Amino acid sequence: MKNLGDWIRQIRDFLETTFLQIDHWFEMNEPCRQHKPLNGGWSIDQILEHISLTNHFLLILIVKATKKSLEKKASSPNWQQEVANYSFQLEKLQQVGVHKSFYWMRPEHMEPKGDMTLVEVRLKLKEQLLQCLQVLDQLKDGEGALHKTTMTVNSLGKMDVYEYLYFLAQHGQRHLTQMENNRIEFENLSPD
């Protein structure tokens, strides 16, 4: 069984890997990135913008929960006992990363509008990764397990800061699959 420190390291690695994989898509040629799939879905550029928008709103929740976790640590001398038997919702959270594994109705404010340039989206994603890693640095001793916030997506229920960070990375993984599907369709439709 993993301890909390192992989970924190795994989450850090997963965040870094996911953001690196997402960043790769900015190097894709423009016609491929702008191709809208035949099913009416988003282009790769739109998906990248959506990832950054979703991260923005998730990070608002993560920062608030981080503050509450640190406040709880400061007011509870025995806080480590509260996280001693830590349990991470790995299986439920992994489903988030599987494209079309469940119905997901996103809020309108997370839909891409084309308000940011591709350069701005890429910069925003890099800043968001740094913000995620800073949160992990702030909560390096397990404090992130002290406060839980409800997540309604896929009936995940109450999640701590570490689970929210993992959710954020899994959301990116979900869209990596979608972008790859777009690329394959574009290549199949393109003349040789």
Where do the PLM segments sit?
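A short small-residue
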Residues: 1-2, 32, 105-113, 152-155
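Acidic/histidine-rich alpha-helical segments that form the ligand environment
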Residues: 18, 84-143
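Short, contiguous alpha-helical
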Residues: 33-90, 127-192
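Extreme N-terminal tail/first-helix region
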Residues: 1-16, 20
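Short alpha-helical hairpin
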Residues: 22-32, 99-105, 144-152
